[in-house]
C-alpha cells in the first residue's frame, strides 16, 4: 500500500506530539517529575516549534489547492531541527549552565543552533499570529548587529556575534527568558483548563446563563454578548478568537432584534476585548504581570477588578441606551433556555469557583490550574452528555497543546525582543526620550505612553503585546513616580485597546466579518463604545484607589464616583439618559463624567432632574 506524504497524512504524528507535550507538562508541573528549569524551557520551545510545523502550513491554501510536497518536507526538516536543538541542550546542559558568561568561547554548534532557533521562532510566530510581532523582533535583532553604525542618539557600542548568541540563546535572557518561562510554568495550565471546560461542553452554561439573565431586558442579545464574552474572554488569550467564539451566536441575534450590523459587530468586539481585562485570568496576562511587575498574582487580580467592572458597566449602559432610544426588542422565547435547565447545570461553574477560591487562598498558580482542571473531569462524570470518554479525554489533551501554540510562539518571540532590549539598552534610550519630551508633565507622559502602547500593540495578541509595552513603556511611568503595578496596568490597558482602535482593530474586524458590515465603520463604533476604557487608566494613575490601593473608605468612594462618571460619559456618548438629550445636556453629561467629584456630580444631577421633569410632562415609551 502506497503512502502519500500530505499534511493530513502526518496528522496522527502531529497529534502524538501534541499529546506528548500535554503529558510532559502535567508530569513536570505537578511535581511528579523533576527537570532543570532551563532544560524545561528548551523542551517546551522545541515541542511548540515541532507542533507548529506539523499542524500549520507556511500559507493558507484554497479548498481544492494541494500543498506542494517540497514545502511539507521542509516543514518536517524544520521540526527535526527543533528536536535536534533540544537534544543538543540535553547533551551539553552542564557545560551550558556552568560556563562563564561572555568569557568562555561560544562553540560552532551553539552558534548554529542559536541561529536556527531564532529563525524557527520567527517563522512559527509568523504562522500563528502574522507579521506584526515578527517585524518588531527582526528589526531589533538587526539593531543588535548593526546598531553601532546608526546616529549617536540611538547607536550602541556594538556586539560580536558570540555575545548576541550567548545573550539570546545560551542565557535565560532571550528565547528562553521570562515570557517562555511563564508560558511553560503557568499559561499552559490555564489553556488546558479552558480546553477541558470546552471539550466537556460545560462552557455552554456561559451562554445559557447570559440568555436567562437578560431575557426580559430590552436589547437583550447585546447584553448576552457582554456576559458571555466576559466569561469566555478571561480564559481566552485572543480578543479576535473570542469574537469568533461567541460572536457567531450573539451578532446574528443582535441583528435580529434590530441592532444595526456595524453596531452589533462593534458590541461583540468591545465585549470580547474586555475579557482580556477581566480577572481571574485576563487572557493569561495576569500571570505575566505578576512576574514582570513583582506585585504578585493576587494584587494584580485585585487591581484589575474595579477597572474591568467599569469597562463592562459603561458598555452595558451604552447598549441599553441604544436599545431604549431605538425601541429595540427582547430575546424571543425560543432563544431563552428553561430556568430549570440552567439551574440544574449551575454546578458547571464550580471549576471556575474552585480556581478563584484557590487563587484567593494564595496557592501556587500552577496548582490552582491543575486542581481546577481535575474538578472539571470529576464533575463532568455526573452527566452522560459531559462525561469524558477515553477518546474525548485524549482529544482534550491534544486541544490543550494546540491551544498553546499561538501564545507560546509569541512568548518565545517576545523573549527575543526583551533580550535585545536588555542587551542594547535601547529601552532606556526610549524612556529617556519620552521623559524629555514630556518634561515635568505627567499627563503628557501618559499621552505619549498611550500612543506608544497603541502602536506596539497593533495586531499582536494579548500576551506579547503586554510584554513589549511593559518592557518599553512601564519604566518611564515608574520613573515619573507611579507605583509599579499602576504603571504596568496603564500600558497593559492601551496595548489591549489597540484591538478596538482603528486602523488596526483586529477584534472589530472580526466582528465586522461576522456581522457582514464595513470594517472601519465597525471599528469606529467600537472605539466609541469602548471610550470609557481609554479614560480609566488616566483615572487610576491619578487615583490609585481605583486599583484597590489605599484605605477601604477611599476605595469605596473612588468606586462610587467612578461609576457615576462612567454613566455620565455613556449617556453623553449615546445622547440619552432618561430620555433624548439636548446639546447642552449632552455636554453637561460628558463634562460631568470627566470632572472632579463635586462638580461632576452636580452637573449629572442637574441633567437628571431636568430630564425627569421633561418625562413627567411628556412620558416616553421605553
Feature roles, as predicted:
Residues 38-46, 181-191, 299-314, 364-373, ...:
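Alpha-helical transmembrane segments
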Residues 84, 123, 128, 138-153, ...:
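Core transmembrane alpha-helical segments of multi-pass membrane transporters/permeases
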Residues 2-14, 18, 302-403, 506-590, ...:
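Long, contiguous bundles of hydrophobic transmembrane helices that form the permeation core
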Residues 207-275, 281-285, 294, 462-494, ...:
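Hydrophobic transmembrane alpha-helices that form the pore/transport pathway of multi-pass ion
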Residues 126, 194-198, 229-238, 270-276, ...:
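Transmembrane alpha-helix interface/packing and boundary motifs in multi-pass membrane proteins
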Residues 1-105, 111-115, 621:
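Conserved, well-structured core domains of diverse proteins
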Residues 107-112, 173-186, 212-226, 257-263, ...:
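Membrane-interfacial loop-to-helix junctions in multi-pass transporters
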Residues 3-4, 28-33, 56-68, 117-131, ...:
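Membrane-water interface regions at transmembrane-helix termini and the short interhelical loops
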Amino acid at each position: 500500500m502506497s503512502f502519500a506524504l500530505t499534511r493530513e497524512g502526518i496528522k496522527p504524528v502531529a497529534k502524538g506530539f501534541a499529546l506528548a507535550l500535554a503529558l510532559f507538562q502535567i508530569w513536570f508541573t505537578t511535581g511528579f517529575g523533576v527537570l532543570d528549569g532551563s532544560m524545561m524551557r528548551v523542551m517546551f520551545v522545541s515541542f511548540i516549534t515541532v507542533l507548529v510545523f506539523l499542524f500549520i502550513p507556511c500559507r493558507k491554501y484554497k479548498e481544492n489547492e494541494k500543498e506542494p510536497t517540497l514545502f511539507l518536507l521542509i516543514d518536517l526538516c524544520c521540526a527535526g531541527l527543533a528536536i535536534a536543538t533540544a537534544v543538543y541542550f540535553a547533551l551539553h546542559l552542564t557545560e551550558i549552565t556552568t560556563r562563564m558568561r561572555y568569557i568562555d568561547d561560544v562553540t560552532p554548534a551553539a552558534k548554529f543552533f542559536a541561529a536556527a532557533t531564532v529563525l524557527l521562532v520567527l517563522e512559527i510566530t509568523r504562522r500563528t499570529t502574522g507579521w506584526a510581532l515578527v517585524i518588531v523582533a527582526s528589526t531589533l535583532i538587526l539593531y543588535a548587529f548593526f546598531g553601532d553604525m546608526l546616529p549617536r542618539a540611538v547607536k550602541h557600542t556594538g556586539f560580536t556575534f558570540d555575545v548576541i548568541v550567548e545573550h539570546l540563546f545560551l542565557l535565560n535572557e532571550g528565547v528562553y527568558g521570562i515570557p517562555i518561562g511563564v508560558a511553560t510554568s503557568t499559561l499552559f495550565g490555564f489553556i488546558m483548563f479552558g480546553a477541558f471546560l470546552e471539550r466537556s461542553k460545560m462552557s455552554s452554561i456561559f451562554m445559557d446563563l447570559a440568555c436567562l439573565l437578560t431575557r426580559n431586558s430590552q436589547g437583550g442579545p447585546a447584553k448576552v454578548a457582554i456576559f458571555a464574552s466576559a466569561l469566555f474572554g478571561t480564559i481566552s488569550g485572543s480578543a479576535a478568537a473570542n469574537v469568533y467564539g461567541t460572536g457567531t451566536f450573539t451578532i446574528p441575534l443582535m441583528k435580529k432584534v434590530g441592532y444595526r450590523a456595524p453596531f452589533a459587530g462593534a458590541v461583540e468586539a468591545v465585549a470580547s476585548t474586555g475579557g482580556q481585562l477581566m480577572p481571574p485570568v485576563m487572557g493569561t496576562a495576569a500571570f505575566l504581570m505578576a512576574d514582570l511587575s513583582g506585585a504578585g498574582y493576587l494584587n494584580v487580580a485585585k487591581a484589575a477588578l474595579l477597572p474591568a467592572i467599569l469597562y463592562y458597566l459603561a458598555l452595558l449602559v451604552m447598549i441599553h441606551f441604544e436599545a431604549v432610544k431605538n425601541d429595540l426588542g427582547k430575546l424571543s422565547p425560543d432563544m431563552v433556555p428553561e430556568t430549570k435547565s440552567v439551574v440544574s447545570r449551575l454546578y458547571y461553574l464550580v471549576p471556575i469557583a474552585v480556581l478563584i477560591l484557590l487563587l484567593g487562598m494564595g496557592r501556587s498558580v500552577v496548582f490552582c490550574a491543575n486542581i481546577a482542571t481535575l474538578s472539571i473531569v470529576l464533575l463532568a462524570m455526573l452527566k452522560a452528555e459531559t462525561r469524558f470518554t477515553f477518546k474525548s479525554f485524549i482529544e482534550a489533551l491534544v486541544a490543550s497543546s494546540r491551544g498553546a501554540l499561538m501564545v507560546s510562539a509569541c512568548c518565545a518571540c517576545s523573549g527575543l525582543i526583551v533580550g535585545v532590549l536588555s542587551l542594547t539598552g535601547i529601552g532606556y534610550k526610549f524612556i529617556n526620550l519620552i521623559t524629555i519630551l514630556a518634561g515635568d508633565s505627567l499627563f503628557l507622559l501618559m499621552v505619549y505612553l498611550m500612543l506608544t502602547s497603541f502602536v506596539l500593540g497593533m495586531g499582536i495578541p494579548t500576551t506579547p503585546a503586554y510584554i513589549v509595552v511593559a518592557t518599553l513603556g512601564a519604566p518611564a511611568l515608574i520613573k515619573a513616580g507611579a507605583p509599579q503595578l499602576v504603571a504596568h496596568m496603564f500600558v497593559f490597558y492601551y496595548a489591549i485597546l489597540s484591538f478596538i482602535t482603528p486602523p488596526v482593530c483586529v477584534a472589530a474586524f472580526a466582528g465586522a466579518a461576522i456581522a457582514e458590515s464595513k470594517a472601519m465603520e465597525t471599528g469606529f463604533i467600537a472605539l466609541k463604545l469602548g471610550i470609557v476604557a481609554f479614560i480609566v487608566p488616566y483615572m487610576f494613575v491619578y487615583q490609585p484607589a481605583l486599583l484597590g490601593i489605599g484605605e477601604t473608605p477611599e476605595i469605596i468612594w473612588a468606586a462610587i464616583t467612578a461609576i457615576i462618571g462612567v454613566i455620565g460619559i455613556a449617556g453623553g456618548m449615546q445622547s440619552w439618559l432618561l430620555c433624548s438629550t439636548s446639546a447642552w445636556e449632552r455636554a453637561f453629561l460628558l463634562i460631568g463624567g470627566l470632572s472632579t467629584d463635586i462638580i461632576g456630580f452636580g452637573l449629572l444631577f442637574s441633567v437628571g432632574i431636568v430630564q425627569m421633569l421633561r418625562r413627567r410632562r411628556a412620558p416616553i415609551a421605553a
